[in-house]
Amino acid sequence: MSDTEVVKTKADYLRDVTTQLKEMRHYAQTNTETLSSHWLAFDEGEYKDGEYAAKFDTLLNKQGKLLDDIDQAIQDLEITVNNLEQEN
């Protein structure tokens, strides 16, 4: 092991965060698809139950907002990384 610590540039750090957010977005999308299938089962399918359909609808809306917010954060970070790279 080395005693020297590697310090990342801000652009490198932001690039790492962007990669992590993209991975999180992938899993969030998968979760949204799972919630959607459960919602359909409660809303129109074989387990028709209005109360659960409403609960899953609320969860889907929140998950959709999370996906939108993650997408926006990714875009903002990518713009910042590009600007930092152009400055150097």
Please tell me what each predicted stretch does.
Residues E44-Y47, Q72-N88:
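Long amphipathic alpha-helical coiled-coil segments
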Residues F56-L67:
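Acidic, serine/threonine/proline-rich low-complexity intrinsically disordered regions
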Residues Q29-E33, L67-D71, Q75:
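Extended heptad-repeat coiled-coil alpha-helical scaffolds of eukaryotic proteins
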Residues D12-H26:
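Short, charge/polar-rich alpha-helical segments
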Residues M24-Y27, K62, A73:
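Heptad-repeat coiled-coil/leucine-zipper interface motif in alpha-helices
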Residues M1-Y13:
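Short, charge-rich amphipathic alpha-helices with coiled-coil/heptad character
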Residues Q29-D57:
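Short E/K-rich amphipathic alpha-helical oligomerization segments
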